[in-house]
Amino acid sequence: VGQSGTGTLNIKQKGHVDGGYLRLGSSTGGVGTVNVEGEDSVLTTELFEIGSYGTGSLNITDKGYVTSSIVAILGYQAGSNGQVVVEKGGEWLIKNNDSSIEFQIGNQGTGEATIREGGLVTAENTIIGGNATGIGTLNVQDQDSVITVRRLYNGYFGNGTVNISNNGLINNKEYSLVGVQDGSHGVVNVTDKGHWNFLGTGEAFRYIYIGDAGDGELNVSSEGKVDSGIITAGMKETGTGNITVKDKNSVITNLGTNLGYDGHGEMNISNQGLVVSNGGSSLGYGETGVGNVSITTGGMWEVNKNVYTTIGVAGVGNLNISDGGKFVSQNITFLGDKASGIGTLNLMDATSSFDTVGINVGNFGSGIVNVSNGATLNSTGYGFIGGNASGKGIVNISTDSLWNLKTSSTNAQLLQVGVLGTGELNITTGGIVKARDTQIALNDKSKGDVRVDGQNSLLETFNMYVGTSGTGTLTLTNNGTLNVEGGEVYLGVFEPAVGTLNIGAAHGEAAADAGFITNATKVEFGLGEGVFVFNHTNNSDAGYQVDMLITGDDKDGKVIHDAGHTVFNAGNTYSGKTLVNDGLLTIASHTADGVTGMGSSEVTIANPGTLDILASTNSAGDYTLTNALKGDGLMRVQLSSSDKMFGFTHATGTEFAGVAQLKDSTFTLERDNTAALTHAMLQSDSENTTSVKVGEQSIGGLAMNGGTIIFDTDIPAATLAEGYISVDTLVVGAGDYTWKGRNYQVNGTGDVLIDVPKPWNDPMANNPLTTLNLLEHDDSHVGVQLVKAQTVIGSGGSLTLRDLQGDEVEADKTLHIAQNGTVVAEGDYGFRLTTAPGNGLYVNYGLKALNIHGGQKLTLAEHGGAMAQRPICRQKSVVKGIWQSIRCDRFRFPTVRTTIRGQPTFRWGHYVPMRMVHLATPGN
């Protein structure tokens, strides 16, 4: 019809044409038209070409009926054009018993088929845009307008478009490919309640490829609807598929959605559009596959039944949810499933959410989850980050967002960071994560890091396990909080685990503001290696308060203090090591069972570090350090009052070489206490009293800063205290001193207490090496040495000499002198503290006058050969009851004992400065 010219065939009023091969516009320039109109008007064909080389039109209307039993082609050759309209109950049947019969729209030319107003078409395999030059369009519109096909190829080598609108319906018996071959382009638009329906059940032959090897699009809007098997966008490496679902009641329901199988797939769900996948779904399936999904403005993707959703199976997958978009899965979601897989999930705002039973971020591949700006991620079964050995997962929860793993059920709700692989969880800027139990580094080869950073950032869990069997780290910084509802935190649970809890920053990093732990009753070092690090910037007097118990019998456990001021309030019982590298660690625990607040750990105070002890280890308020002590930093002791005892034990050892600054406390320098300070500086501050026991007490140094030192000796007579201190350095002057490279400041004041008996019992020079006879008491530089020192800083002039009762010993003092138990005289002495001649601290004393009691005998020297130092002397004798002074060059007593009534007895051979001798009672 219309071979070279224009021809028209009208079949109506029950007209009937039985044809074989029918061509409309069979030659170039030909225009052929066939109209089949009215009920029982029939056209039968075998081969039907509408626009073979020219232009052809077929109109089937008002229940007209057409059949084609071999093939039907619209726009057969290049340059041809074929148009078909089936409307108003008209029907076109393109089939026979052979399912391979084809309906071609735009084979090499241009073809368009429109089914409207209740038109019906039944076909087998339908090909739209069959060849490279072919352009085909299929329009199905209006209520009751239906085309039923077996297989639909839209854009085979050419360009194809399918428009389903206004309640139009396409029924697919098997599968559909949109953008079949490389270079092709196919588009399907389902809009205005149009419906693309795949018949039958199950997965077989009900699938859709959007972009098989070419370029495909599926657009569903304005209440359009698609029901199918599995939909794949970007099937082959060259395939590119785009799916758009928008508007309320626009729905795709399928048996699974795959974006980027081996090619590139995109899906955008917006404006309350909905995708329901009743089967496994993936983004980036093969290694070359890239799948991207965007859910926005109230759009939703539901994955139902017992199936997985995988973002980045072996390829790259990205799921972005914003502006109220939602994802809901009734099973598990994987990100980065296989080793080459890379999966990313972005939740971007407060109205966006992601709900899944469980989520595995970085199963064998790499997974990243970013939840921000108030968005919510729910995975109430579990959350795994770094699932398997090669897996690496990162989850970032920020800006008031929530990851919730908790339900009213007691099952699962586990958060595991580093299961068999490497996991990282960052909770920042007010982000919140809630789980039943949280485990970091679950297995021995795994690694997990959790960071809670920023005000209102929160990790809430029942119990916390850091380093279950692998290497795990939890950092609480910048006011981030760990809330432990079950009260227990475990570090390094099983061998060979290493579990580290950082307050502020990690060891070796710059200090940061501290985070907090709430509701925890204990931090326990397990069978592996537990490490508790304090590296923060809180340097206030109150400090960072640690109220929970630190416990655990872990020989490898460590408490590391790098910066800030930290206060331990519990009677900690951990073992291992306490390393005070820098900053101030205060022990403020009060126990009654000997617990020091640092357990049985070995304590090392590095040079910049300071350890403050404000604690007690018994009910009386005393404190005994039972820990091994090392390092060359500062240990300060300030107990609840100055009468509370501080001391060391044998376990303390002799390796501490720093400064022991004793404030409010009482300390005894003997045995273990002395040994502990063998290489250390003892600094005695205000309200400290240190007693020096009998014998040599050898320590590294002594510095006076307002404290009190009691020496176990009496004066005068002694030249060396019964209990004295030997030091390398003695600091008894105001100013700075340096010890082990660290500067300290003292005021050089303090009290030195010695025994000044009332009366003083003259030892009678019973040991000539350590005591002096009375005759020698007026010699130059006579004194008792209290401290022996290699180096002396200061003169001791600011020190105060006191007796054991605390009364100041005046520079001029009269002593009652007893010999052999009887007071026989009074001596006028001068006393002062001095460091001359530069080798220690002395109490210098000098006898200025003797008043001998009447009827008493006074022995000035017990051993022969004694001589007064001064050559000029005075002798007083009795002449008619009046004292006279006799000047003598050098007075020598008789060589035999002479006894004069009322006068003292002198032994032979002694020189004595007689200016010192006064009889107590004139006239005797």
Language-model segments: residues:
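Extracellular beta-strand repeat scaffolds in secreted/surface proteins
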Residues: 9, 34, 58, 82-86, ...
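N-terminal segments that cap or nucleate solenoid repeat domains
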Residues: 1-12, 113, 218, 319, ...
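Short "repeat-start/strand-capping" segments in structured domains, especially the N-termini
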Residues: 5, 54, 98-100, 109, ...
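Extracellular, surface-exposed repeat/solenoid domains
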Residues: 475, 483-488, 493-522, 705-846, ...
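Tight coil/turn sites that cap or link beta-strands
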Residues: 14, 63, 89, 108, ...
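Surface-exposed loop/turn positions within long extracellular repeat scaffolds
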Residues: 18-20, 44-45, 67-69, 96-100, ...
